[in-house]
Amino acid sequence: MTLLEQYIDCMRKGDECALADLFSKDGILHDSSWTQAGEDTLHLSGKMAVEMMFHHKFGYNGGPFPISGVKFMEENVAWYFIVYHDSVVPVVAYLSSVTEDGKIDRLNILPM
């Protein structure tokens, strides 16, 4: 599986530890799709921040956020629908940078 496929798989499973392991030590996740559900943009720096935030997010949600309609445009770009609380949000995920050892350096999630 590509990194982006693994990311979506971890999100679907609600596995914050495996999700964090996809990121480099200082990897960045920038997710502005949360604004479509009335929340602040999520900007996380570092795999520990990713693990801690999604431990909280999955716990508060009662499990993973449903993801459907995934379409990979290319290896580093995917479109999908994600449900935050009661809001269905169409997003594009763009893996903009990967480290030499194959970890996510920067992943941007944007609402469409």
Which residues fall in each region the model found?
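Short glycine/proline-enriched coil/turn segments at helix->beta-strand junctions
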Residues: T2, S45, H85-S87
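Hydrophobic pocket/interface hotspot
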Residues: Y7, L19-A20, G27, G46, ...
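A beta-strand edge to alpha-helix "cap/lid" segment located at domain peripheries
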Residues: H55-M112
